UniProtKB/Swiss-Prot annotation:
Alphabetical keyword list: Cell membrane, Membrane, Transmembrane, Transmembrane helix
Subunit details: Probably composed of three subunits: TtrA, TtrB and TtrC.
Name of this chain's protein: Tetrathionate reductase subunit C
Function per UniProt: Part of a membrane-bound tetrathionate reductase that catalyzes the reduction of tetrathionate to thiosulfate. TtrC probably anchors TtrA and TtrB to the external face of the cytoplasmic membrane. May transfer electrons from membrane quinol to TtrB.
Membrane topology: Multi-pass membrane protein
Origin species: Archaeoglobus fulgidus (strain ATCC 49558 / DSM 4304 / JCM 9628 / NBRC 100126 / VC-16)
Keyword Transmembrane helix part of the UniProt annotation: yes
Predominant cellular place of this UniProt entry's protein: membrane
Protein family: Belongs to the NrfD family.
Transmembrane domains' residue ranges: 26-46, 53-73, 104-124, 160-180, 193-213, 233-253, 258-278, 288-308, 334-354
Compartment annotation: Cell membrane
Domain of life where this protein originates: Archaea
Entry GO terms, CC: plasma membrane
Length: 361
């Protein structure tokens, strides 16, 4: 039995259909990192730390975060009904639908609110830089043509950034919250450290994609590279610790069913430990820095696949491990949202400047 939005509970035969949440859910869970990028942009503005990376954080964050509501995070079991999260949100308890739907709360209320706040924040931030850039999209300066006018906008930007921090932070644990609530999946309901695991993964994905974009854009600024490496390495070692602790907890239970997910967890933990070591080395030897985020993102892919796909293969009936049965078009479905996010990234990076002068920020 599983929850399907908006109809309610549905029943299935796990032996006829071992995989209910297809790999496309894995892609959307990756794109949640857009919320972390928006969070980093807001914190950078408020603290003054990593300020030169704010344009990159905003462009990447909006590109990723814009995509996540288009599919399975609205209804991972029945993604074709995703639009109903906006048209039929269950934000209040009714006789037909008792309680409040977490999916409706996030998709019908929190996503539009977070997106609108982030978009206004980004437009205000880029207003004067767009005037200085000129060209076709200079109208996005919204009449802000002087440093004095831009300075008057900064209090409003700080208020929006302060609002954006808690809104974005709530998204970092949303996939973990959604998976953990699926008590009909044995592995997920017993994955006690799922929320901190997702929190660490989103930071690794966010900082990893930012580091990759840093090199693709040929930026040369230690004020961006070094702090990003620090956050990236801290998230990697923390996530390795979470995975090791979770395996230790399962080991104390002595339950053989978790053998289906432990090998890939071990591999992911080793990858994240190696990532941490490489971040320390690359702080001195910059040439190896591009390897670090690629390795870390590979670890995230391994870990998410293990959680989402292998986690479903542990029988809910206690009958051992099931065989995976994926839909024929699973790869195209999994790649499409990531491709759309990359397309948005290309468009936004063409419109908005990836680097902003200090006096214009």
């Amino acid at each position: 039995m599983l929850w399907s939005y908006p109809e309610g509970f549905a029943y299935f035969n796990e032996f006829a259909q071992s995989i209910i949440w297809e790999p496309v859910a894995f892609s959307y869970a990756l794109l949640i990192s857009g919320a972390d990028l928006l969070l980093l942009a807001a914190l950078a503005l408020l603290s003054g730390y990593l300020r030169r990376a704010i344009p990159m954080f905003l462009i990447l964050g909006l590109s990723f975060f814009s995509v996540i509501l288009l599919g399975p995070l609205a209804d991972l079991a029945l993604p074709h009904r995703a639009t109903e999260i906006l048209t039929r949100p269950h934000l209040a308890s009714t006789e037909m639908h008792p309680g409040i739907s977490v999916m409706a709360l996030y998709g019908g209320l929190l996503w539009p609110l977070t997106f609108i706040v982030a978009l206004i924040f980004a437009l205000l931030y880029f207003s004067y830089p767009m005037h200085k850039k000129g060209g076709t999209f200079s109208f996005l300066s919204f009449g802000v043509k002087s440093e004095e006018s831009y300075e008057r906008l900064k209090p409003a930007m700080k208020v929006l950034a302060a609002i954006l921090v808690p809104l974005s932070a709530l998204w970092t644990i949303y996939p973990g919250m959604l998976f953990f609530s699926q008590t009909w999946i044995y592995a997920w309901k017993n994955w006690g450290l799922m929320l901190p695991m997702f929190f660490g993964e989103t930071f690794i994905t966010a900082t990893g994609t930012a580091l990759i974009l840093y090199y693709l854009e040929r930026m040369e600024d230690e004020r961006i590279r070094y702090p990003l490496l620090q956050i990236h390495g801290a998230a990697a070692i923390a996530l390795a610790g979470v995975l090791i602790l979770q395996m230790f907890i399962w080991g104390m239970w002595g339950n053989p069913n978790f053998a289906a997910v432990v090998p890939m967890m071990q591999a992911a933990a080793v990858i994240f430990l190696l990532t941490f070591i490489l971040t320390l080395v690359s702080a001195k030897y910059e040439a190896i820095t591009p390897i670090v985020p690629v390795l870390a993102l590979f670890g995230v892919v391994v870990n998410k696949w293990n959680l989402i796909i292998n986690g479903q293969l542990i029988s809910r009936a206690g009958m051992g491990v099931l065989e995976p049965e994926l839909a024929p078009n699973w790869l195209a479905e999994a790649v499409s949202p990531i491709a759309l996010a990359i397309l948005l990234l290309v468009i936004l990076s063409y419109i908005f400047p990836m680097e902003v002068e200090e006096d214009a920020a």
